[in-house]
Amino acid sequence: MGGISIWQLLIIALIVVLLFGTKKLRSLGGDLGGAVKGFKNAMSSEEEKKALEENATDKPAADTAKVTETAKVAETAEKKAESKGKEQA
């Protein structure tokens, strides 16, 4: 029972509208919305930057894995060629 009821909130809202006017409240709401949108854009750009940095550090490891796999394939091909050469001789 210590909380604010819906009627009390409506009376407070009416007083605020009477004091500031609808134009001032509309511009204040637009400014607040623009600030929130700017904050969200800044946060998402920071997350994208971190993701790009993580991908940049992970990429050399992936390239190393490809080189290792290619080396294994080449080694297997050399062994097959050697065994064919021994069979023919």
From Swiss-Prot:
Comp. bias regions, Low complexity: 62-74
Location within or outside the cell: Cell inner membrane
Family assignment from sequence similarity: Belongs to the TatA/E family.
Summary of subunit composition and partner proteins: The Tat system comprises two distinct complexes: a TatABC complex, containing multiple copies of TatA, TatB and TatC subunits, and a separate TatA complex, containing only TatA subunits. Substrates initially bind to the TatABC complex, which probably triggers association of the separate TatA complex to form the active translocon.
Keyword list, A-Z: Cell inner membrane, Cell membrane, Membrane, Protein transport, Translocation, Transmembrane, Transmembrane helix, Transport
One GO term of the biological process aspect: protein transport by the Tat complex
Pfam families: TatA_B_E
Coiled-coil residues: none
Location of the region described as Disordered in the Swiss-Prot/TrEMBL record: 47-89
Entry GO CC: TAT protein transport complex
Protein name: Sec-independent protein translocase protein TatA
Keyword rRNA-binding: no
Origin superkingdom: Bacteria
Membrane-related topology note: Single-pass membrane protein
Compositionally biased intervals (Basic and acidic residues): 47-61, 75-89
GO terms, molecular function: protein transmembrane transporter activity
Transmembrane segment boundaries: 1-21
Annotated function: Part of the twin-arginine translocation (Tat) system that transports large folded proteins containing a characteristic twin-arginine motif in their signal peptide across membranes. TatA could form the protein-conducting channel of the Tat system.
Family annotation (PANTHER family): SEC-INDEPENDENT PROTEIN TRANSLOCASE PROTEIN TATA (PTHR42982:SF1)
InterPro entries, A to Z: TatA/B/E, TatA/E
Primary location recorded for the protein, binned into one broad class: membrane
